[in-house]
């Protein structure tokens, strides 16, 4: 199942715990404003965090000229002619930008807390400390999907959203989670933005991701149940054939009364009806 990280982590599940600035405070505030404008264009779980930061200064946001996402690193964009870098330490190292020592970063990044850096041109200006949490309903549905044998593939522009983070927060195995690279992520966006031809709806939801997960899990369970019922019915037919053949060979067909046949059919009917319910 393909999902967007913004649906997996809706507003309120990613919380800003603190901001560490590097250099002057004015430069850090300017960098955060530029990053806020950039994330408003990009979207994703971090956009809600930056909306909280600049809630009173939305009219003062600078103009975004373009951006790219680097796999597992973060966003690099142009805002008012300046290069804004927003992402994990690996992104800054790849761009040869100095970042704090890993030991210093580890003081903030532990458990459900993660950090993300903001850089302007060639300088790191700020580090945001974020806490990620799992929505309870989404967590339950993801676990149910995993039990049904369905994996989840996430489209994200947030470098902190990794299979390991999703696995830890939602209580599922890392093997059940995948993350799209930038190329496939772009293809995903094209597909979801395309207009879908009109068709008869076999299932309808209100658009919530957990509702769609619930539907998919239910469909998988129904398919398994149908397969089990068919197997039980086949076993009943084979057993009936063997029993009749055995009685015919020994000339005991006269012992099959209407009551015995009725009870035999009633037994298998009870098995077919009750066993799927017990399985659930």
Spans of features found by a protein language model:
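ATP-binding glycine-rich phosphate-binding loop
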Residues: 66-74, 90, 107-111
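Juxtamembrane helix-loop transition segments at the membrane interface in multi-pass membrane proteins
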Residues: 275-280
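ATP-binding catalytic core of ATPases
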Residues: 19-71, 94-95, 102-104
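Cytosolic beta-strand hydrophobic patch enriched in CBS
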Residues: 2, 75, 114-120, 154-155
């Amino acid at each position: 199942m393909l999902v967007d990280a913004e649906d997996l982590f809706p507003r309120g599940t990613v919380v800003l715990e603190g901001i560490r600035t590097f250099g002057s405070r004015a430069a850090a505030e300017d960098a955060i404003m530029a990053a806020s404008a950039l994330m408003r264009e990009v979207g994703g779980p971090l956009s809600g965090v930056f909306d909280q930061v600049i809630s009173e200064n939305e009219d003062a946001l600078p103009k975004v000229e373009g951006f790219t996402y680097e796999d597992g690193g973060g966003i690099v964009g142009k805002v008012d002619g300046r290069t804004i870098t927003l992402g994990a330490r690996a992104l800054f190292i790849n761009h040869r930008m100095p970042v704090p020592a890993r030991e210093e970063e580890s003081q903030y990044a532990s458990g459900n807390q993660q950090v993300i850096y903001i850089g302007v041109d060639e300088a790191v200006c700020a580090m945001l400390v974020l806490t990620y949490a799992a929505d309870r309903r989404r967590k339950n549905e993801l676990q149910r999907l995993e039990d049904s044998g369905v994996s989840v593939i996430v489209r994200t522009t947030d470098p902190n959203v990794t299979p390991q983070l999703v696995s830890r927060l939602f209580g599922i195995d890392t093997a059940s989670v995948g993350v799209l690279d930038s190329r496939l992520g772009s293809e995903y966006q094209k597909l979801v933005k395309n207009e879908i031809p009109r068709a008869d709806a076999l299932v309808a939801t209100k658009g919530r991701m957990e509702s769609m997960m619930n539907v998919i899990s239910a469909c998988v369970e129904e398919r398994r149940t149908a397969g089990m019922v068919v197997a039980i019915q086949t076993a009943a037919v084979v057993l009936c054939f063997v029993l009749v053949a055995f009685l015919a060979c020994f000339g005991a067909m006269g012992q099959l009364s209407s009551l015995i046949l009725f009870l035999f059919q009633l037994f298998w009917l009870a098995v077919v009806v009750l066993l799927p319910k017990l399985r659930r």
